[in-house]
Amino acid sequence: MSKAVKDIDPNAEIFGPALFGYGAFTNFADAPDWKEIKNDNPEYKWFIDYYLDEMKKAEDENGRRLLDVLDVHFYTEAKGTCGKRYCEHYGDPDCVYNKLNSTRSFWDDTYTEDSWITDAGAEFLPILPALKESIDTYYPGTKLAITEYDFQG
């Protein structure tokens, strides 16, 4: 698709893949073929690495950049003090604080969110430095966009 767009407008910026959250970043939402790809390519720490590397290979084959912006979505998985992920206690200062504090999952390596992500290891939190590292390793020059997010704040 990006080749067709670039054929019509070489200056168009192509965004992709618009992954929906942490599970999609790490293992493409448990796609069955991802396990085989990962086993055959242990250098890929997560799906983002594989995607960027494949886009770089496609650029090399086509002689032009086919992905301009790595596009991801991120939604907090952090729980409020009530223990719920989508806490609706908007009048409870502690729940509101936890929701607003969860934005730190983007950038703060001293922050540990209370969620299934940290229970599973949180290898790629904070998310922005992890994404930037993958870009720098597999497809330098790619921009980054978080085009959808929700922190329930």
Question: Which residues are covered by each model-predicted region?
Answer:
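Noncatalytic carbohydrate-binding groove/subsite architecture in carbohydrate-active enzymes
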Residues: 1-153
